[in-house]
Amino acid sequence: MPAVLGFEGSANKIGVGVVRDGKVLANPRRTYVTPPGTGFLPGDTARHHRAVILDLLQEALTESGLTSQDIDCIAYTKGPGMGAPLVSVAVVARTVAQLWNKPLVGVNHCIGHIEMGRLITGATSPTVLYVSGGNTQVIAYSEHRYRIFGETIDIAVGNCLDRFARVLKISNDPSPGYNIEQMAKRGKKLVELPYTVKGMDVSFSGILSFIEDVAHRMLATGECTPEDLCFSLQETVFAMLVEITERAMAHCGSQEALIVGGVGCNVRLQEMMATMCQERGARLFATDERFCIDNGAMIAQAGWEMFRAGHRTPLSDSGVTQRYRTDEVEVTWRD
């Protein structure tokens, strides 16, 4: 019964998780929160992660009831992500692996999301909508790879939402996306915004540029409220995501859809995806914020699968890769 300790820190979340044989034993997490109207810089984010990671490690061990002797493998996020935070976490993972004399496994962040989603929901072979601050992809498993059937051709959907939040100076606590979601519930008017889908790919830079350009003028003239803009942006970008997911499901002949990534815990997105799945006679699988948002347990779970399949990351190859494609990884742990 191998137990794996996972470190995640590719963006503004830092987490340490423990997984043993399909059970999440611990999953503490911290978030680097910046003032309204601002984003998070790599150097500042890395300093935050370094300041709290050892406390999180101790918290994870205490919560799991395990000691270093009980851990069989150390997993860490190899990429993709922001360089400085990734490096900070990788250094700690390497150090712990050497101090405890444990094997090390570098995990693709995107695959961590997928494996956690499969574990928690029980989805067997879904078409995956992976939506976060750094990634937007439609993925399906085929011949030992998680194949990307569609993706953003510019910025991620979460990045679009976050940057819009800066325009209105919406709070980043607990996250700009969550606060947009709450404001959107009070929106009454649907403002027409650019809608860009190309096959199974999407583009969000145009809709962001448009809404950045018109937001203050429309608010100043009373054409709409901030809540209306949040509602309109959500409805438009989520409709784009539902469309490309349905197209991928039709292409793959899939009867399951799984939403993963930080944006995936948005209830409105889940509602729209559920409607599409219901009309297709398919099932929707999604998780809550404990497992959708970046966390250490998802890295531990993917690391657990990889460890059991014989994967090991030598110290000489234990760096990070900021641009690490989902389909670069050979998925040897699945049939």
Curated annotation (Swiss-Prot):
Cofactor(s), by name: a divalent metal cation
Cell compartments where the protein resides: Cytoplasm; Nucleus
Cofactor note: Binds 1 divalent metal cation per subunit.
Keyword tRNA processing: yes
Molecular functions (GO terms): metal ion binding; N(6)-L-threonylcarbamoyladenine synthase activity
GO cellular component: cytoplasm; cytosol; EKC/KEOPS complex; nucleoplasm; nucleus
Keywords assigned by UniProt, alphabetized: Acyltransferase, Cytoplasm, Disease variant, Epilepsy, Intellectual disability, Metal-binding, Nucleus, Transferase, tRNA processing
Pfam families reported in the protein's UniProt record: TsaD (PF00814)
Residues annotated as binding a divalent metal cation: 109, 113, 130, 294
Primary residence: cytoplasm
Any coiled-coil regions, as ranges: none
SUPFAM superfamilies linked to this entry: Actin-like ATPase domain
EC number(s) from the headed UniProt entry: 2.3.1.234
Mutagenesis or variant effect for residue 14 to F: In GAMOS3; strongly reduced formation of a threonylcarbamoyl group on adenosine at position 37 (t(6)A37) in tRNAs
Subunit structure: Component of the EKC/KEOPS complex composed of at least GON7, TP53RK, TPRKB, OSGEP and LAGE3; the whole complex dimerizes. Interacts with PRAME.
PANTHER family linked to this entry: TRNA N6-ADENOSINE THREONYLCARBAMOYLTRANSFERASE
Protein name: tRNA N6-adenosine threonylcarbamoyltransferase
Organism of this sequence: Homo sapiens
Phylogenetic classification of the source organism: Eukaryota, Metazoa, Chordata, Craniata, Vertebrata
